[in-house]
Swiss-Prot record:
Pfam families recorded: TPR_7 (PF13176), TPR_8 (PF13181)
GO terms under cellular component: plasma membrane-derived thylakoid membrane
Membrane topology category: Peripheral membrane protein
Localization per Swiss-Prot or TrEMBL: Cellular thylakoid membrane
A GO BP entry: photosynthesis
Physiological role: Essential for the assembly of the photosystem I (PSI) complex. May act as a chaperone-like factor to guide the assembly of the PSI subunits.
Positions annotated as TPR repeat: 35-68, 72-105, 120-153
Record-stated family: Belongs to the Ycf3 family.
Keywords: Membrane, Photosynthesis, Repeat, Thylakoid, TPR repeat
Matching InterPro entries: PSI_Ycf3_assembly (IPR022818), TPR-like_helical_dom_sf (IPR011990), TPR_rpt (IPR019734), Ycf3/AcsC/BcsC/TPR_MFPF (IPR051685)
Name this protein carries in UniProt: Photosystem I assembly protein Ycf3
Length: 173
């Protein structure tokens, strides 16, 4: 096992050195380079499970980053952390901000739908069928958008939509 870990550490270090070299020679403004470095450090912290540190790096990156696609990716990663921490409302809010920056992120829609579907299951377990239907309908709405953006990419969601009767025939066109 240690040999695999050493190999993985070597690959991580090699990738970091290569990425840093590329960033140094790229013909981009210093501000954009700093934004990328904060993003990269946030991603590393997130991958290591240090979510509070990752959020700090991501916030610094957002202060500098101007590219909407990159901002959307950073916000999506922040939303994933909030979702992992059980901060569902903040996660949804952050996913929605990510979609404003870059509307072509089906994974944001998928994850919002997961939260809504979870709330629907919870309402059902508590016997509140009206509330269940509200949450399931909201899940179906965002999941339908995700499936349109990424056809065939979320087969489990497509099946849920069909099996729950919440699939529209034009969804797959």
């Amino acid at each position: 096992m240690p040999s695999n870990q050493n190999r993985d550490n070597f690959i991580d270090k090699a990738f970091t050195v290569i990425a840093e070299s590329i960033v140094k020679i790229m013909p981009i403004a210093e501000k954009e380079k700093k934004a990328y470095i904060y993003y990269r450090d946030g991603l590393a912290a997130q991958n290591n499970g240090d979510y509070s540190e990752a959020l700090e790096y991501y916030k610094e990156s957002l202060l500098l980053e101007e590219n909407k696609i990159d901002r959307g990716e950073t916000l999506k990663n922040m939303a994933i952390i909030y979702m992992s921490n059980g901060e569902e409302d903040l996660s949804i809010e952050t996913y929605e901000k990510a979609l404003v920056e870059n509307p072509k992120q089906p994974s944001c829609l998928k994850n919002i739908g997961l939260i809504y579907e979870k709330r629907g299951r919870y309402a059902e377990q508590n016997g509140d069928l009206d509330q269940r239907d509200i949450w399931y309908d909201k899940a179906a709405e965002v999941w339908s958008k995700a499936v349109r953006l990424y056809p065939g990419g979320y087969l489990d969601i497509e099946n849920w939509l069909k099996n729950s009767g919440r699939s529209s025939i034009d969804m797959y066109l």
